[in-house]
């Protein structure tokens, strides 16, 4: 059955399906929307007591529900300045060193950091010998993405690509998955050096948003788009540790890259398949 599921992903019209789902998710259909949200809550066992708006009737469309805010204080931020924090609610897929420009995906699969970053050679060079962490957001999870550490935005890259599912089954069976799917790469300058936040699209994930650009929707095609941002002066965008930096419509994956010698060690309990909660300690900063 697993082989059938993977085979179907290669032949199904993933972009068309995602566009259709995106239109439905943005549609305001009153009681139909409310009924669908209630079904989703029950199907995925979502704890709505954590949501700022716990009632399904509070959401005019599915997208509002998918990107729902949490109650203030429900995710306390680790205040130890020696640690960066989890950027999302989800589960660790993989993490570890970037070895010879390669990032581990799953048993028998890896991919290049250069490909992940949209073949931006200068960017990839900044993360040689560094560390990575890949976190999967399931449909049930909180879908907003936050800053692991204070950082100033220096560059954004949009990389067109496939829209394979990014669940654990697909990660174990589709070579180079995260470097094949559509993605948005945001690079920040931080006190520990450059940090890349790679927001990876997936099947029926209708769009990726950032707080500075809104929904990232370059023209359809195979061209990579880049935007450079000032890191000093009145137009520089600096986001504090724990601040929202983006969001997914439904769920997907975040890949983080850090420079060599930026991180000392991952926090206790942070390992593949471990559950992540935004704001908790993720990794200790190198002294």
From Swiss-Prot:
Pathway assignment: Phospholipid metabolism; phosphatidylethanolamine biosynthesis; phosphatidylethanolamine from CDP-diacylglycerol: step 2/2
Enzyme class: lyase
Cofactors: pyruvate
Compartments where located: Cell membrane
Organism, as annotated: Shewanella halifaxensis (strain HAW-EB4)
Active-site residue list: 89, 146, 252
Site positions for Cleavage (non-hydrolytic): 251-252
The protein, known as: Phosphatidylserine decarboxylase proenzyme
Topology versus the membrane: Peripheral membrane protein
A GO MF label: phosphatidylserine decarboxylase activity
Known role: Catalyzes the formation of phosphatidylethanolamine (PtdEtn) from phosphatidylserine (PtdSer).
Classification lineage: Bacteria, Pseudomonadati, Pseudomonadota, Gammaproteobacteria, Alteromonadales
Main location: membrane
Subunit annotation: Heterodimer of a large membrane-associated beta subunit and a small pyruvoyl-containing alpha subunit.
């Amino acid at each position: 059955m697993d082989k059938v599921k993977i085979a179907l992903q290669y032949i199904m019209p993933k972009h068309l399906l995602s566009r259709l789902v995106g239109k439905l998710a943005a549609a305001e259909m009153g009681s139909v929307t409310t009924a669908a949200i209630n079904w989703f809550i029950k199907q995925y066992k979502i704890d709505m007591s954590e949501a700022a708006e716990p009632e399904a009737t509070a959401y005019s469309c599915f997208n509002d529900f998918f990107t729902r805010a949490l109650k203030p204080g429900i995710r306390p931020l680790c205040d130890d300045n020696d640690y960066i924090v989890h950027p999302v609610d989800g589960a660790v897929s993989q993490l570890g060193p970037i070895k010879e420009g390669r990032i581990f995906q799953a048993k028998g699969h890896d991919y290049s950091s250069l490909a992940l970053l949209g073949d931006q050679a200068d960017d990839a060079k900044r993360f040689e010998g560094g560390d990575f962490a890949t976190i999967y957001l399931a449909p049930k999870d909180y879908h907003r993405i936050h800053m692991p550490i204070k950082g100033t935005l220096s560059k954004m890259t949009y990389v067109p690509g496939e829209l394979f599912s990014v669940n654990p089954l697909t990660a174990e069976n589709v070579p180079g998955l995260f470097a094949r799917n559509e993605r948005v790469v945001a690079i920040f300058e931080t006190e520990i050096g450059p940090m890349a936040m790679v927001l990876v699209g997936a099947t029926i994930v209708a769009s990726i948003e950032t707080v500075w650009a809104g929904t990232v929707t370059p023209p359809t095609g195979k061209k990579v788009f880049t935007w450079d941002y000032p890191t000093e002066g009145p137009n520089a965008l600096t986001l504090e540790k724990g601040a929202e930096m983006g969001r997914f419509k439904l769920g997907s994956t975040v890949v983080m890259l850090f420079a060599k010698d930026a991180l000392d060690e991952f926090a206790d309990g942070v390992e593949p398949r471990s559950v992540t909660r935004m704001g908790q300690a993720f990794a200790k900063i190198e002294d």
